[in-house]
Amino acid sequence: MDDEKYYIVKKKALPEVLLKVVEAKRLLDSERVMTIQEATDAVDISRSSFYKYKDDIFPFHENNRGKTITFMLQMDDIPGLLSMVLNQIAKSNANVLTIHQTIPIGGIASLTLGIEILPQTLELSQMLESIEALDGIHYLKILGRE
C-alpha cells in the first residue's frame, strides 16, 4: 500500500517528464490535440512515458472555498459499505459535494464522489487510505482535482 500513498509536491521538485505528462493531458482535455501521439509529440516525451505516469500525476488547484477532489471506488454490494465510506469522509472533516452509485452488477458497484477539502480537513492521503482499506473496497482511483 506504500506505493499508493499521495503526496503534494511543489512543481520545482518534480522531474520534467512528469510536468510534460500533465501538459500532454491538458492538451488532450482542451482538445488542442486529438491523439495521445500528437500530445506526446507536442511536449516531447515518449508515449510510454505518458502511459507510465498518466494515472499518477494531477495538477492540484485551490479555489476560494477549498480544494475539490473527485474519485471513483469499485466496491462490493454489501449493506452499510457506502455508509462506512461516507463515515470515513465525515471523520476527516471533508464535505461531500456529489455522490453517484451505479446499480450493482454481479455484486460490484461503482461509486463516484466529489469531495470538498476544507481547511479543517485532516490529511487527505490518510482519508483515502482509510477508505481504500475498508473491507469490500476493490480499488480507489482519483479522477480529478480542482
Swiss-Prot record:
**Span of the signal peptide:** none
The superkingdom listed in its UniProt entry is: Bacteria
Family matches, as InterPro entries = ACT-like_dom_sf, ACT_dom, UPF0735_ACT_dom-cont
Q: Which SUPFAM superfamilies match?
A: ACT-like (SSF55021)
The residue ranges of the ACT domain are 70-145
Q: Which residues cross the membrane?
A: none
Q: Which HAMAP family match?
A: UPF0735
- Which family is it part of? Belongs to the UPF0735 family.
Q: What is this protein called?
A: UPF0735 ACT domain-containing protein Cphy_3604
